[in-house]
Regions:
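Short glycine-rich substrate-engagement loop in P-loop NTPases that contacts/grips substrate
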Residues: 2-30
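Conserved AAA+ ATPase "SRH/arginine-finger" region at the nucleotide-binding site
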Residues: 3-6, 80-93
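Alpha-helical scaffold elements adjacent to nucleotide-binding pockets in ATP/GTP-utilizing enzyme cores
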Residues: 11-18, 47, 51, 74-78, ...
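Conserved RecA-like P-loop NTPase ATPase core
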Residues: 12, 35, 48, 63, ...
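Conserved catalytic/switch belt of AAA+ P-loop NTPases
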Residues: 16-24, 34, 38-77
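Helix-loop-helix "sensor" segment of P-loop NTPases
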Residues: 96-117
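C-terminal helical "lid" of AAA+/P-loop NTPase domains
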Residues: 118-123, 129-144, 154
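C-terminal engagement/docking regions of AAA+ P-loop ATPases
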Residues: 150-171
Length: 171
C-alpha cells in the first residue's frame, strides 16, 4: 500500500523494484494499492507506467476525484475504472443495524430511538463510512451519559462535531 499523500517517486520506484524482484525470484505477484492517487504528481504517475505495462504489479488506485482529470492518460488507459455510487437509504440502514448488533461493532450496547435511524441515514448521504462514524460518535455520547437509547438529539450533536472534521478533509 502506498499513500499518495506521503510517497514520492523514490518510494514508488522502491516498491516497484521489490515487486519486480519478487516476481522474478519466486513468481510472487504484487498488488499495489494507491490511496488518493489524485494527489500523485505527473512524475509519480509516470514512474508507475513501466511496472503496469510490464505487469510487474497489479495496481488498484482509489480517488475521490474525477480520474479523467487527475490521472494521466497513459495510466488511465491501462486501468479498469470502477465507479462507486452512493448507497441507498435501505443499504445504509442495514449497515447501521449490523453494526449495532455485531460483536465486532457495538455489540448491542445501544439501541436506536425513534427517528434516529432516519436522521443517521439522511446525514450519511449514501456514505457508509460516514454513517458508521456518526453512529459510533452518537453511541459514545449516549453511553457517556449512562443511557442505552440513542436519541435524535444524540445524532444531531454527534453530527455537529463530526461535520467540522468532514469539511476539513472531505471524508
Amino acid at each position: 500500500e502506498v499513500s499518495a499523500v506521503n510517497a514520492g517517486v523514490k518510494e514508488v520506484r522502491e516498491v516497484i523494484a521489490s515487486a519486480k524482484h519478487a516476481l522474478m525470484a519466486s513468481g510472487e505477484e504484487t498488488v499495489l494499492f494507491i490511496d488518493e492517487v489524485h494527489r500523485f504528481s505527473k512524475s509519480q504517475q509516470d514512474a508507475l507506467l513501466p511496472a503496469v505495462e510490464n505487469q510487474w504489479i497489479s495496481h488498484v488506485a482509489a480517488t475521490t476525484e474525477n480520474p479523467s482529470f487527475s490521472v494521466i492518460s497513459p495510466l488511465l488507459s491501462r486501468s479498469l475504472l470502477l465507479v462507486l455510487h452512493p448507497l441507498d437509504d435501505e443499504a445504509i440502514g442495514e449497515t447501521l443495524q449490523r453494526a449495532l448488533k455485531s460483536a465486532s461493532g457495538l455489540n448491542a450496547a445501544v439501541e436506536l430511538g425513534e427517528g434516529s435511524l432516519g436522521v443517521l441515514t439522511r446525514i450519511a448521504g449514501g456514505d457508509a463510512r460516514k454513517a458508521l462514524t456518526l453512529l459510533e460518535a452518537a453511541a459514545a455520547a449516549t453511553l457517556d451519559r449512562g443511557d442505552r437509547l440513542i436519541t435524535v438529539e444524540d445524532v444531531s450533536t454527534a453530527a455537529a462535531s463530526a461535520l467540522v472534521r468532514w469539511d476539513e478533509d472531505q471524508h
